[in-house]
């Protein structure tokens, strides 16, 4: 477990992370959503130590798109579940790659769009459902 955490931490500090590009089409799609949304948040499972790198990446690729970045600290003792954050912010919808997160949000009357992949790639953890979407 410690080795896994160190690998993830090292990745966020790496040049490889800094050079990551968003999935094709997402910058444009988020811009369109921004035109119609009062507020847009990033709710990510990343741990707090990746905040600076994540904010820098978001500013570069998605300038003036999101109102705030919320880190849930997944897989730590300080984790806050995404559906709880959505409820506390009174969000009406979420886009997420986790079927579990989308299901919990749906149960709270939050519209959920479960992204299961892009192009010819399907995420290995994805579940086919009526919520399932791809970025294409």
Task: Map each language-model feature to its residues.
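Substrate-recognition element of Asp-dependent hydrolases with the DxDx(T/V) motif
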Residues: 17-21, 26-57, 69-72
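Conserved phosphoryl-transfer catalytic core
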Residues: 1-14
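Acidic, Mg2+-coordinating phosphoryl-transfer loop and its flanking beta/alpha structural elements
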Residues: 91-135
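Pocket-edge positions in alpha/beta enzyme catalytic cores
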Residues: 15-18, 77-78, 130
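Substrate-recognition "cap/lid" segment bordering the active-site pocket of phosphatases
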Residues: 45-95, 99-102
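Surface-exposed amphipathic alpha-helices with a cationic face
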Residues: 30-34, 87, 102, 106
């Amino acid at each position: 477990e410690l080795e896994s955490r160190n690998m993830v931490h090292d990745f966020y500090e790496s040049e490889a992370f800094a050079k990551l590009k968003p999935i094709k089409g997402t910058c444009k799609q988020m811009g369109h959503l921004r035109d119609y949304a009062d507020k847009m948040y990033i709710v990510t499972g990343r741990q707090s130590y990746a905040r600076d790198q994540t904010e820098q990446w978001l500013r570069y690729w998605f300038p003036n798109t999101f109102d705030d970045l919320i880190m849930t600290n997944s897989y730590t003792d300080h984790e806050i579940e995404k559906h709880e954050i959505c409820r506390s912010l009174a969000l009406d919808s979420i886009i997420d790659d986790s079927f579990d997160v989308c299901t919990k949000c749906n149960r709270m009357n939050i519209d959920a769009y479960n992204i299961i992949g892009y192009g010819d790639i399907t995420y290995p953890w994805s579940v086919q459902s009526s919520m399932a979407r791809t970025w294409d």
